[in-house]
Amino acid sequence: EENETITPDTNTGSYYSYTQDKLFALLSDTSSTVLLSASLQDEISDVGKRGCIVGNDGNWDYLYSEKTGLNTLGLGWVHSYMYGAYAVMLYIPDPETGTVKTAIFKWLDAGWQKINMVKAHHIRGGIERFAASMKSVLESPDLPEVSEIVDKHEELLQKDEGELRQLVAPYLESIGTGKDAKSCPSHFITSVTSGEYLQQMDSDEIIRILLLEYIKTHIGDRAPETAADRVPVNTLGQQSS
């Protein structure tokens, strides 16, 4: 079982937290070994809260708030939820080319008043977004070794909250004063520039940002503004109900 908090949705700006069960299995035959990953949302998510994608989604910069609702005009009142999410992923190696093909099957039930508002194109967009980010990380020749990332994580865990706040402060300053600040509702940026956002962050959240920034500095160019420009997705695996 794992706790999951998704990044803000590209359509509504909302984000959700929930628990899910996850399974990994290796399926072997005489020619190759396929990795299977399956996930199942345990129960209804926490109520959707407002987040913001800062600038280009490919920059992986996000802000989160405790305000419920959607950023969509006229829907700030909505109490939305993820009622159920299920996914199956297959990683299929091709020994001849040295590449790995990935198949993703996704089912999602989300909305409000127990009505599923998810359409197939929403799922497709989410898959393209995920695939572009995964591809840019795994194919980077400068991706740190797993042991290096683990060591960096351990190093950050040893720091107290005051030290962590000092380390993440320059990042938040760049978010609040940068050219992409205008892409977020004003209350987000006001919270960042006033220092309120930093003071509300807990150690886990700060460490997630610092670790992500560590990886970003190593892998260089990342996902383009439109993930579909780079990652073709077959729609066979899409289901919205």
Locate each region found by the language model.
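Terminal "cap-and-tail" regions of soluble proteins that handle hydrophobic small molecules
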Residues: 1-241
